C-alpha cells in the first residue's frame, strides 16, 4: 500500500512540483492550497506524513503545526516543514523547539525532497 503524503502549500506551482516528485517515488500525494481547511483535511485524508509550508496567508504554518500537535487524533503524523527561512536559528527552532520531524528549505533539490520525505518514515518506525 502506498504511503499517503499531504502537502499543505499555498503556492500552487510548488505544491504541484512536490506532488509530481513524490509520486515518482510511489507515494500517494494530496495537496491543500488553502491553509484554513488544512487541519480538517488532515483528519479526513489521514496521511502518513505532512509537508507543511510556514508562510501562508490567513493561517500560518506554525499555527497549523500547533493545531495538529494538539489534536489527539492526528498528533502522531510526522511533519516536515517547507520554508524559505534558511537561517540555522530558524531550523533549530523548527526541529528542536517546535519538534518538527524534518526541515526542508526552499529552494530545495529533488533528491533532498525525496530523502527527507523517506526519512520521515524511518523516524516513525524507531
Segments the model singles out, each with a brief description of its role:
Residues 9:
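Conserved acidic carboxylate
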Residues 16-24:
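Charged docking surfaces used in two-component/phosphorelay signaling
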Residues 26-33, 41:
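Short hydrophobic/Thr-rich beta-strand motif most characteristic of the beta2 strand and flanking loop
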Residues 45-51:
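Active-site beta3 strand of CheY-like receiver
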Residues 53, 83:
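Active-site residues of response regulator receiver
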Residues 56:
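Receiver (REC) domain active-site loop signature in two-component systems and cognate sites
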Residues 107-118, 125:
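C-terminal output helix
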